[in-house]
């Protein structure tokens, strides 16, 4: 009897450099920032700016930041995504589980090719973006749709979002409670989501509404009052207006108004990465300390059992 799974779950994260070095970071950023879903400027104008100005400057600077959070096993985002895939495989023995990156390695299209070579008949693609955006989830959808033309015999579903999924919300809420039990509870809980250019939201991207729905669902699960939490957006890039309120200035204003301690969680990130570990856990903590306040960072769900069980349940329902 053949017991080899013919259904696969493919979890896809954003991507990461292969090492915390300027050349590796430049290669990664070149691929990431060349995606028209990410930067909509026509290539004729964008490429000279990207290769002539942005990569030479950001490559070394970003490499220094990656070096601060790099793990012995590699990039935090890759390490935790790989471990999460292993946890999913453990709770889904009747499925084959793989992981891939939209940018960098393991490349999404190559991973889809490997699944086809294994004889997989059905693939559920789960982008590790709880909230949908045309700049993230849709980019994965683009790659999958292009690949489908070469593999019409394989059924493929792409999960679009899980911003209010009950299992995921419960896992986030429980991770916050567990953090409070160990570290104590601060005066205010901050939800920090990755930012997005305001023009993208104005064009109809549902991301900000989904971020708000995620925060509200977690707040409801925790039973918090309106004065006990705040949300904002981080990781702004460039000079144009992004979604507001900006997370870090919001924290500063609250600190200057008398709030002395904050807990902070990033529900838009499935796994910890540069933006959560270096920008938030280190950077926000430093600037708040200058204002007489403290920040206690609550890690992402990463490869926790609760995370694996929540995602597995989503995949089985797809």
UniProtKB/Swiss-Prot annotation:
Main location: cytoplasm
EC number per UniProt: 4.98.1.1
Single annotated GO MF: metal ion binding
Record's keyword terms, sorted: Cytoplasm, Heme biosynthesis, Iron, Lyase, Metal-binding, Porphyrin biosynthesis
Subcellular location: Cytoplasm
Pathway(s) annotated for this protein in UniProt: Porphyrin-containing compound metabolism; protoheme biosynthesis; protoheme from protoporphyrin-IX: step 1/1
Keyword check for Cytoplasm: yes
Matches recorded under InterPro entries: Ferrochelatase, Ferrochelatase_AS, Ferrochelatase_C, Ferrochelatase_N
Entry's Gene Ontology BP terms: heme biosynthetic process
Annotated Fe cation binding sites: 194, 275
Class of this enzyme: lyase
Example of a GO cellular component annotation carried by this entry: cytoplasm
One Pfam family cited in the UniProt record for this chain: Ferrochelatase
Record flagged with keyword DNA-binding: no
Protein known as: Ferrochelatase
